[in-house]
Amino acid sequence: MSFKKFPRHLLSIRDLSRGEIVKLIDRSSEIKQAYKQNFQNRRSVQMSGLSSQNVAMIFSKRSTRTRVSVESAVSCLGGNAMFLGKDDIQLGVNESLYDTSKVISSMVSGIVARVNKYSDVATLAKHASCPVINGLCDTFHPLQALADLLTIKETFKSFDGLKVAWVGDANNVLHDLMIANAKVGIHTSVAKPKDVNVRDDILSIVNEAANENGSTFEIVNDPKVAVKNADIVVTDTWISMGQEAEKEQRLKQFTGFQVTGEIMKLAKPSCKFMHCLPRHPEEVSDEVFYGENSLVFQEAENRKWTTVAVLEALLVNRGEILPPASA
């Protein structure tokens, strides 16, 4: 049985129910464990769901983790990833997004788009005849949120009652992480500068999800308040792509928001640290970033395994998100 409507897209974590998120995380873990165990035993794992199929990677922004994770995930499923950078195709320049979506989706089994604006990936999805996955835009980053949840589940075994403290900018990564946390029962406390605002429409989505799933969220202006009793502290870049000209201003704006050892001491003694990378020293000290409670490289690797699960669900299973085979 396939999903009621094909193609099914993933543009934000809001597109997934709590149950679907949990299934994707469990399936990601199952795939990861199978590959790790077979690698240790020098046996190969053969997944052929995308055999002889192509996945287009439409990237208007440079990337390390998203590109490598998507290409390796497609390979895991036996498919071929076609990287289409901003200099390779005429995305919204000499050809409309409508035309681009129609043409490319007619030749591939799926599209992963890393673009500047949410409206761009939404337009691609609206007119595509194959699934479109948001690899990052200015508003959402669902693949990162799934990798974060897998990392949290591996570490704490359960989501229930955990507290995540976010320290820093109100950006695309925060948006989907807040929504994801609210859906799976994780409490979120966000510390941001007074003159940085979380969008009202995002807060509305988070509030609805929190009410439905028994989680809470709060927004404060003091990192010391946010991290109190936190199980995980998360931060991200203060200067996203396209904001380079604002660097000096933004560094002043985020004074006092570096995650340091002193900040971590205010959280639970077992508190972990996460960062989606790339990292800059003004955001987090070396002591924390490279410390024994840092999960940053495990988190980065998990981008691959959650992407495999998403591709399998949307492309191979035609939108149906199934429980892990071992369930």
From Swiss-Prot:
Signal peptide positions are none
User: Which top-level group of life is the source organism from?
Assistant: Eukaryota
The EC number(s) attached to this protein equal: 2.1.3.3
Q: Which Pfam families match?
A: OTCace, OTCace_N
**Known pathway:** Amino-acid biosynthesis; L-arginine biosynthesis; L-arginine from L-ornithine and carbamoyl phosphate: step 1/3
A single Gene Ontology CC term: mitochondrial matrix
The catalytic residues are C276
Reaction equations catalysed: carbamoyl phosphate + L-ornithine = L-citrulline + phosphate + H(+)
The UniProt entry's GO biological process terms, in alphabetical order, are:
arginine biosynthetic process via ornithine; citrulline biosynthetic process; L-arginine biosynthetic process; urea cycle
Q: Does the keyword Mitochondrion apply?
A: yes
- Name the Gene Ontology molecular function terms of this record: amino acid binding; ornithine carbamoyltransferase activity
Localization, per the record, is: Mitochondrion matrix
Key word Aminoacyl-tRNA synthetase present in the record? no
- What does this protein do, in the record's words? Ornithine carbamoyltransferase involved in the synthesis of arginine from glutamate via ornithine and the urea cycle.
Assigned protein family: Belongs to the aspartate/ornithine carbamoyltransferase superfamily. OTCase family.
* Quaternary structure, from the entry: Interacts with trx2.
Name assigned to this protein: Ornithine carbamoyltransferase, mitochondrial
Organism from which the protein derives: Schizosaccharomyces pombe (strain 972 / ATCC 24843) (Fission yeast)
Name the gene.
arg3
